[in-house]
Amino acid sequence: MVSQGAFAGMSRRAFLAKAAGAGAAAVLTDWAAPVIEKAYGAGPCSGHLTDIEHIVLCLQENRSFDHYFGTLSAVDGFDTPTPLFQQKGWNPETQALDPTGITLPYRINTTGGPNGVGECVNDPDHQWIAAHLSWNGGANDGWLPAQARTRSVANTPVVMGYYARPDIPIHYLLADTFTICDQYFSSLLGGTMPNRLYWISATVNPDGDQGGPQIVEPAIQPKLTFTWRIMPQNLSDAGISWKVYNSKLLGGLNDTSLSRNGYVGSFKQAADPRSDLARYGIAPAYPWDFIRDVINNTLPQVSWVVPLTVESEHPSFPVAVGAVTIVNLIRVLLRNPAVWEKTALIIAYDEHGGFFDHVTPLTAPEGTPGEWIPNSVDIDKVDGSGGIRGPIGLGFRVPCFVISPYSRGGLMVHDRFDHTSQLQLIGKRFGVPVPNLTPWRASVTGDMTSAFNFAAPPDPSPPNLDHPVRQLPKVAKCVPNVVLGFLNEGLPYRVPYPQTTPVQESGPARPIPSGIC
């Protein structure tokens, strides 16, 4: 594939003149005309990737794409014709497990009646075994049986629940204001920690020679355990500034499963308190250090942001609180227009959280190096493996927003991305290689440059985002489920019966951004 970047700064005439000088103009005109027209068709570009000086990354928690945006207009959602919306294993009429019973996706209504349960649903099983059983060898039809193994009968069908615009209005407003990606996948068929390891290092070390394979979420996060190279090290070596801003508000619980830190402290390389990994990957606090750096024009070129767990949207924590977190993050950037106008903020979700998604992820063929746990590793000694060697990924689809003056307008990108795509974007912008990225994964995921609309003038004006605090009163009803749901014993949300097939909102097609032009 010819990169459009090859034509940067060169007119059509200059391109063909250069080709003619090599005696190949006639051949190249026929061969390259479609490429040239695509590269120049929009006319002069209003922006370029180099105009983005700050890339800010934030991963929220445990929501699939269909679960949040199956009803959004013009995306690959509930209007897509597929039998996969009819999942077997639960009978809505009898409200019981039934191998032949069919459950359709159903709305979890948070806007009327006793909505506390809907706002804070029980936490589904989303670890390595359950995710692979849901995927079911690529059939993508094991969602309900996978939950029945570990969850109560009444809480099994919550994986088929979804939210609509009235339930998560801020999320839908973000999709209408910026760029949403409807083919963004988690990196691994499993839970939080391994996916976040992909977010900073593009691997979980399946070969097991540097502290892995780490394929499940441990109760206590490993300290100074792993030794493989991570993206922050490559950035430091290249002279690119970076920080990981972690919430410190849980104190002694920051290194337990109740926290979601950046995991830099899990690597032996961070043992020296004078090292870049310790100074920039462990010490910075969110939000205070982040706010200070934005205001003082000292925001690094690359930032990983890790809010407090209760703000992460992880079930059974309230989705409305997560909306507050996202809006507050955007508002921090808006406090300094000079920073905002040259920043790209990417907000995605680390994994599907057990919630259904109808798009079967692309996975690597068995035995693909770096994408399966090899036979040289004793699989029975790999915590949480259940004897399953792979595939590692891609995982299921998750929501992803690209928020920037260069991604305004309710845009939609259909290119395939995963968490390593965020690292690939950093690599593309700053010329830094992504460590551990397998050839297979590099060949099937993009670098996210196509999510930007560089052909249009940037729009740095403050977006019209209603602050979601008005959604918070209903959160008080969540208190019992916040505790019980995180322990997998939450009050169930009753599946409505009779069921109806969900539909997407009506509306025009969403424009596709230009990417690099």
Swiss-Prot record:
Optimum pH is 7. It is found in: Secreted, Cell wall. InterPro entries: Alkaline_phosphatase_core_sf (IPR017850), Phosphoesterase (IPR007312), TAT_signal (IPR006311). Pfam families: Phosphoesterase. It comes from the Bacteria. Induction: Expression is induced in vitro in the presence of phosphatidylcholine. Also induced upon infection of THP-1 macrophages. GO terms for molecular function: phosphatidylcholine phospholipase C activity. Optimum temperature is 37 degrees Celsius. Predicted to be exported by the Tat system. The position of the signal peptide cleavage has not been experimentally proven. GO terms for biological process: symbiont-mediated disruption of host cellular anatomical structure. Residues 1-39 form the signal peptide. Its EC number is 3.1.4.3. Gene3D superfamilies: Alkaline Phosphatase, subunit A (3.40.720.10). It catalyses: a 1,2-diacyl-sn-glycero-3-phosphocholine + H2O = phosphocholine + a 1,2-diacyl-sn-glycerol + H(+); 1,2-dihexadecanoyl-sn-glycero-3-phosphocholine + H2O = 1,2-dihexadecanoyl-sn-glycerol + phosphocholine + H(+). Keywords: Cell wall, Hydrolase, Secreted, Signal, Virulence. Belongs to the bacterial phospholipase C family. Involved in virulence. Induces cytotoxic effects on mouse macrophage cell lines, via direct or indirect enzymatic hydrolysis of cell membrane phospholipids. Hydrolyzes phosphatidylcholine. Does not have hemolytic activity. PANTHER family: NON-SPECIFIC PHOSPHOLIPASE C1 (PTHR31956:SF1), NON-SPECIFIC PHOSPHOLIPASE C4-RELATED (PTHR31956). This is Phospholipase C C.
